[in-house]
Amino acid sequence: METTALLVCVQVPEILSIIYIRMPTMQQDTLRHFLLEAVSLLALYHPGAVIDSLLQKQLPMDRYVHCPGPTDGQEPPPAPWRPGERLALPRASQVPEPGGSRGNFCSLAVTLRSCGGSWGGKFFVDHFLRVLMEKLKNLGSDQPRTSSAKPEADEEEAALEPLKMTRAISVVVSALRSPEAVQHLLPELLPVLLKQISATVGKEMPSSPLSTRGKLFLKGHASDDNPCRLSLETLEAVLRTCLDGKWLWLLRKQGAWAALEDPRAHHDGVCLLTGVLLRAGTISLPLVLVLTRWLDAPSANLRVTAAAFFAELMKEPALQEWRCLQPIARALLEKLRDSSSTVRQMAARGLGNLVSGAPEKLRKHKGAVLEALRRGLEDVAAAEVVAESLLALAKVVTELKGKAVGSTFRDIARATKGFFDAEQASLRSAAFTLYGVLAASATRRWRSFFTEELGSTWASLVLHLRDPDPGASMACQGALRLCAPFLGLRRVRQGLAVNTRLSAAELLGDVCSQLVRSCAPGRDGAAGPSPAPGEGGSG
């Protein structure tokens, strides 16, 4: 095999079949080692053919090879392998008695670790992972079907193929001692695995009994019945190889893995993952360019993943450094009209995050951003889009101040008050937050208008001090504190500032008491809560 491995491409399946048959009959460890070495040699020269064969069945050779975890083994690596040199066999200590297996690629991975040095190991893993990634790309869920008349069993078998590729990547990466072989492939691995996660979120494992051959490869794994979890565990294995442990700890602490697996929170999980990867310095321009194309993908899941990724990325100046900010911002403006409400929500979040990542660009294109987010308030069929637009507008108006907001100030204020009594607590909280920002940002031009608006909204603000949702109640307190100067209610403003530890009921009682005192003739304060210029009135 050492002299002819390069010439036997056509015979690879036959050779592996012979090894498959003979391995259980081998009684001597030495002979098994020779067979494993033969498989390793074939894989070095014909990785595609070997991978195809390995994915077909649960290889008995896995029973005879121990696949250590990422931290197992303290021995120094062997001398580098180079083409033409004899491959060193695994030590006997690495081959325990027949026992459990961690997957079809375990034997191959351990053989590589034993016989592959710095050059051979990198060459092998690079080639091996590239073949797996290419196969996974070609099996993408958004690829058109070649035939609509496939038997159900064939369709379910085809659905298992990406999962087997994903599992293979996990096993190979987990068996490596050095991260170098994976680190330089990370910009290519990340989009492949993110795409697989997006394709499997909310899905179940194919259940056809005729698909058992493919399921053998996944059998015994913790995520047997959850294809998305399998993809997430593979991504975690890759990141564990490349990143410092503190970043993996942070992902777990923030609940990123659980969110990524949940169809209702997948977008938030992508934001958490992107934020950690940014801080770890693993977001690169090639990854950004790949995900840019996903924004217009036929798959809604891919568009959600891409929109959430860029919503978080908008917080950082990296897009400006790569000269990608303008096309991405333009794409997010367009995505506010996407058919997916989650995509629209993430687009609004991304535009709001321009405040942190590119405030000068926000000021330059403030008209388009304000108008787009104002239109988002009209998306009443999707409460999450409206809430995100309200919060984004709060950030944008705070940055621009009232003068730069222009005539849109009036439209935003009128639209915002319509959500004070919304059924969803997230809408009420976001509306109170934005209303307080509008009060703080109102310039002389808009003070008279805003005072008139408060004539119809102050009662609602007071009542929602006792909002059943704690977040909405706190946001209402902040808004009322900022609106109090427009009403001439100095005592109310002072009471809100001083009594910060009162319960909602106690605070409401205190504010009502202050209102009664303010309305009493001859007392400090106006005769009513709506002292617009040139107007009187009572509360």
Where are these regions (language model features)?
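Hydrophobic residues within the alpha-helices of tandem HEAT/HEAT-like
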Residues: 1-2, 35-44, 72-80, 108-119, ...
